[in-house]
Amino acid sequence: AEGWKGCYALGSSYIALPWWAGMATFGQLTPDVMVLTVLYSIAGLGIAIVNDFKSIEGDRALGLQSLPVAFGVEKAKWITVGTIDATQLFVAFYLRGIGEDFYSNVLFCLIAPQIFAQFKFFLPDPIKNDVKYQAAAQPFLVFGLLATGLAWGHHVNMLAA
């Protein structure tokens, strides 16, 4: 994806739009849900950047300004992990703030192996290890999305009771 907009568009199409459609159909699409999913879409932006590392030569040849081309590999790899980690940490603290401590703790536990995989695979060589990193880390991010959805469902049910 080219630049910030392309990566964010990709991340939001995978995360925010399906969640919003589901909430609009089966629940209630509230500002809180929109904020949580926009945050996870920023994590999705980071995931989209991971895919750009393997295309650096082609992007340069075609004049595409993917983040690794625009910022260089060193800066782009830190932008990548920063967006993925910071947004999930913010969501975990948000869940704690609304009283969903159990789910917040679950999310913290799911973030830890992602950070481990970042230091083991991605940060040393994002071009060579992108697939290893995604295989090791992505399932934990997806389970984090699930935990956040369950937390929100629990929170809404507790408010309704």
Give the residues covered by each predicted segment.
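Multi-pass alpha-helical membrane architecture of UbiA-family
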Residues: 1-161
